[in-house]
Amino acid sequence: MFNKVTKTFQYGQHSVVLETGEMARQASGAVLVSVEDTVVLATVVAAKKAKAGQDFFPLTVDYIEKTYAAGRIPGGFFKREGKPSEKETLTSRLIDRPLRPLFPEGFYNDVQVVIHTLSVNPDIDPDIPAMIGASAALAISGIPFNGPIGAARVGYVDGQYVLNPTATQLKSSKMDLVVAGTENAVLMVESEAKQLSEEIMLGGVVFGHEQMQAAINAIHDLVRDAGKPDWDWQPAPKNEALIAAVSAAAQEGLNAAYQIREKQARTTKLREVYAAVQAAMAEQAAQAGQPAPDSVGVDNILFDLEARIVRSQILNGEPRIDGRDTRTVRPISIRLGVLPRAHGSALFTRGETQALVVATLGTKQDEQIIDALMGEYRDRFMLHYNMPPFATGETGRIGVPKRREIGHGRLAKRALLPLLPAPEDFQYTIRLVSEITESNGSSSMASVCGGSLAMMDAGVPTNDHVAGVAMGLILDSGKFAVLTDILGDEDHLGDMDFKVAGTETGITALQMDIKIQGITKEIMQVALAQAREGRLHILGKMRDALEGSRTELSAFAPRMLTIKINPEKIRDVIGKGGATIRALTEETGTQIDISDDGTIVIASVDETQAKEAQRRIVELTADVEVGQIYDGSVLRLLDFGAIVQVLPGRDGLLHISEIANYRIANINDVLKVGQPVRVKVIEADDKGRLRLSIKAIGGIEQQQSGTAEPAAQSEPQAE
């Protein structure tokens, strides 16, 4: 019934099993990947024909996590999985990026890659098995695909590279790098690091590419035994006559357009050229008695012509699109404290790219609780990236963030994360929001720069500024040029774009997408060195604007006071059913967070109210000391004395013989319920019961005359 084929290979410390032929047999290709109890099913289906008028490659990649993989039932009312999580979105992008360049030019059939996580070992992230599975499913499907690819995660522990480290090992690793590529070329890199040098980062890329050959070889073996016949597909023949006609009609206009340095004016000129060429081609066809050529085909020819013009200008040493040379960063403008009520804000402008980044400080209660498949955790640092359509002078949909926005936000977050102060040094939750108000390339790196500035403006004690720069590469016939701070057009027309963020010390985030084969280690070394040069230039501009973190928080940011109590006293602060802490927060207008170790953090915009809450907590948790004098209150009267509260929740017996220096016949003659009295603690037994005395400090008659000894004062101690 089943024709199951299995291949096993050793991959670092893990054994990886590839299986096909048993599950999802109606898909074009399906592979089950197992790595130490983490199991993913990767499937691919391709349409046999492209849709009419299709002018781009419609690849869809969906990575899907099911809670049953971790032995859990989804929360919520419906008890089933809902919209994709951020992890699912980011992993889908991670798989998409190295696969997309390997489909042949002109292949416009719908292709859908779906990866389900069926079982998860919390120590092994499913993303690498998912990438290997997607590559294997495509390779055995027969769909036109210039793969397979391999993928590897690389850590850096104790000065050594580690292949596919576990989640536990990553906690002590200075690098978390994912690299994907073919046998001969690296295609994609995604990494975060703790200020490592360019040499170490590049070494990690090379190490990962070398090690992934084991996965690529296993996929080749699987294809040999279980691969389907290759599709009989050929790209549509090029219309050389149309190409020549379009080139002749457009060359002069396109050359003129790319002499215009300002983006909007250049875009307007390009639209005019496109419209004029379309009209000219239609007119020529009409004169020849033929139908007008396909407008999509004409546009594609024009785009290829644009690419040749821009690339040849750069390789021949001519100025770039906006007039710069290959190493110059666009002019930078920085303004701080832009928003009066925000806790911190920065407007970072680099050429025609602009980011308004806003920092907001919150309490532990504002942390994001993430119910991840590999285990729930709390996140005290959030970075949200938004790019509305007006940033590029366009109209469009406004709504939930798209995959691109989520990916850019994650990259910027990775860049800034290593510089955050430890939670014990800065207990605030931090949220950064990057609003892209203009975009012409490198908006994610503008978010990094603006985010670093906004945090310092808010008083977050980061150790150093973090800057980011987007780089590009043009490679043709052995000649190459590395471009610093690329424009949007250079991104589309180039062969590699990579983003590098970090401090003067080293790299904190690296993202690389390579669109062609033939890029050597030496070219990447040049590119990384040039990126460092650009990054240091930007860091200098940022330091000129703000040397270091502000010493004072915004007046609108919450103030935090920290006290430490005996953990056994926590119940006294919370009270029965939470009544005590609820009353405390409502009456003082504060937020109070209590840790199991007895650490209490009080937060309030009003520092006076925070100190009042602190005082009351100290009272609630103070220990009564024998020999100390306290201001108390009579709770109730007894025939033989009174019960007096000396501290919140602590009371003792005041015997009738310890009230005055004379004999009292009736307790009601000297005390009333609610009456304030000053008492001395004269005894505490092993059960914590207190004996009190007024006589020991002069007697009730002295208090009534106003000459009583003062009570002890408890001073709250803030950490």
Curated annotation (Swiss-Prot):
Its EC number is 2.7.7.8. It is found in: Cytoplasm. Gene3D superfamilies: GHMP Kinase, N-terminal domain, K Homology domain, type 1, Nucleic acid-binding proteins. GO terms for cellular component: cytosol. Keywords: Cytoplasm, Magnesium, Metal-binding, Nucleotidyltransferase, RNA-binding, Transferase. The keyword Cell division does not apply. Residues 558-617 form the KH domain. It catalyses: RNA(n+1) + phosphate = RNA(n) + a ribonucleoside 5'-diphosphate. GO terms for biological process: mRNA catabolic process; RNA processing. Belongs to the polyribonucleotide nucleotidyltransferase family. This is Polyribonucleotide nucleotidyltransferase. It comes from Bordetella pertussis (strain Tohama I / ATCC BAA-589 / NCTC 13251). The lineage of its organism: Bacteria, Pseudomonadati, Pseudomonadota, Betaproteobacteria, Burkholderiales. The gene is pnp.
